[in-house]
Amino acid sequence: MALSACSDWTDTESINLAEPGIDEQSPELYAKYLKNLQEYKNSDHKIVYGWFDNSEKVPFSRGQHMSDVPDSLDVIIVTTPDLVEFELKDIVSVHEKGTKVFYSISYDNILKEHTDKVKEGTETSTFSAYLSAELNRLIALEAPFDGIVAEYRGSNPIYMSEADKAEAKANQDTFFSVIANWKSANSGKKLVFQGYPANLIGQSVLSSCDHIILITNDVTDVAQLGIEALQALMADGVPADRFIVSASTISLDTTDKTTGYYNALRALSEAAYWV
């Protein structure tokens, strides 16, 4: 018996499969769809925001592209403002659908970063100096975006000592003065506040904000949405005509019947009905 084999190796080769989308299959129909979508988003309707984790800078699935989020979103808020080339192209794509792209500047995240770095021994500056430097760095990234979400949760000043209250106000002044200066220089862009209005000390920023996003993504029933709104309105200078409530989507874990639910009901749909 004789055995034989091929003497040449056969190398595997990846093949790029590009399935045509509706924009290529029917350009005229897609153009009409975009026109109708843009007209709707420019009309008077309930505004829908969505947060998008764009931390993956070498995407390996369509789910990591802003251009593949649902067209129904009015605003995408990215978690990382440092963008790479494919993300800039994605922004152009979603703009064609009338979707805006914002990024968030979080006071509380900056505070946590400074605290952690001080503990690690990698940061020696005061928080005030660190806050100013970080704000300047983040504001410098604003060019590709349609707006900024200024996030401030903080602590309730009612329970602060006078010294702590003065320090909190000084830090708020630093934070919101940079935000306000940016808004003054960019009147065509949007400013949104996210956080607890009751924790602001002598700040007038809310009157300049297009929307106020309340921290409600962890409430457990729809009645608490009204409670959060009433608590926000108890603070001085809070406009009542621009609240946005937040709700979580359901978990990918099918056994999790808590995340994204108000009791047994979907939180997203119930929050939409409440608005």
Locate predicted features.
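N-terminal carbohydrate-binding/catalytic regions of secreted carbohydrate-active enzymes
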Residues: 43-105
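Substrate-binding cleft of extracellular glycoside hydrolase catalytic domains
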Residues: 81-171
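Substrate-binding cleft of secreted/luminal carbohydrate-active enzymes
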Residues: 241-275
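Bacterial Sec-dependent N-terminal signal peptides
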Residues: 1-43
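Acidic (Asp/Glu)-rich catalytic clusters
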Residues: 65-70, 85-103, 137-144, 201-207, ...
